[in-house]
Amino acid sequence: MAGIQLADEVTSVYNDFKLSHKYRYIVFKMNDGMTEVVVEKTAEKNATYDDFLKDLPEKSARYAVYDLEYDTPEGLRQKIIFYLWTPEGCKIREKMLYSATKATIKQALVGLSAEIQATDAGELNLDEVIAKVKTISK
């Protein structure tokens, strides 16, 4: 399991996301051979959280980063959220590989503010994500 690599595009696309605020979110997946993490999709800045949720498959695991903007009494805040999506319908081996590789991808994606691990859509509720981020950011 430790042999899974990150494609070069993972860090280059993430750097565009982080430094240039070029995308609202990025979805990453493992290639068909389960040997490398690759970029599956990038979404333009005008994409919504609902668009993001629709891009997470019902029966396959994914990693994702989301550029979350939310209001506080002090003004607008912006945080990069890392997601590990392992839905109930995905295969056990796939869940294990994604969980085992999570530390590798997180190490490459510098500047993450929070992590959300979810197995069903209810755990991805935007209000709950924002509440978690606010708690961490205090």
From Swiss-Prot:
Boundaries of every ADF-H domain copy: 3-134
Cytoplasm keyword on record: yes
SUPFAM superfamilies registered for this protein in UniProt: Actin depolymerizing proteins
Keywords: Actin-binding, Cell membrane, Cell projection, Cytoplasm, Cytoskeleton, Membrane
A single GO cellular-component term on record: cytoplasm
SMART domains: ADF
Top-level division of the source organism's lineage: Eukaryota
One record GO biological process: actin filament severing
Cross-referenced InterPro entries: ADF-H, ADF-H/Gelsolin-like_dom_sf, ADF/Cofilin
Gene3D superfamilies reported in the protein's UniProt record: Severin
Keyword match Mitochondrion: no
Subcellular location: Cytoplasm; Cytoplasm, Cytoskeleton; Cell membrane; Cell projection, Phagocytic cup
UniProt family annotation: Belongs to the actin-binding proteins ADF family.
Protein name: Actophorin
Organism: Entamoeba histolytica (strain ATCC 30459 / HM-1:IMSS / ABRM)
